[in-house]
């Protein structure tokens, strides 16, 4: 189904891989991109379970918009192992204006397709999605 605001479709593969990340924990992260010609959100990169947050941030282009989900593991003050799934909307200041508008207008519709997101971050530079920011958001 297309998003009425931007006309974007979400590929079935996006939904399937997200379910695998959420239920089976087959992936640590997924980076998504919009294919403007196909008018579709598709997978750009899949991160293996053993990959780190640093591997994740390196997989996102410096000057191009992307959506991403990251499965963050942490230990609570009560010593319980938990995880939260973060949705990150990456829209760097250096990306094209058209691209920023396209990602912004498609974000909510795309996010609704990914049932199970617990925390959302919007970032325009790497400091806005640092590991410290992620750690600070798990207890909100």
Swiss-Prot record:
Gene3D superfamilies named among the record's database cross-references: Severin
Compartment(s): Cytoplasm, Cytoskeleton
Domain of life from the UniProt record: Eukaryota
Key words of the record: Actin-binding, Cytoplasm, Cytoskeleton, Phosphoprotein
UniProt-recorded Gene Ontology molecular function terms: actin binding
Gene Ontology cellular-component terms listed: actin cytoskeleton; cytoplasm
Lineage: Eukaryota, Viridiplantae, Streptophyta, Embryophyta, Tracheophyta
Primary location class: cytoplasm
Protein's name in the database: Actin-depolymerizing factor 10
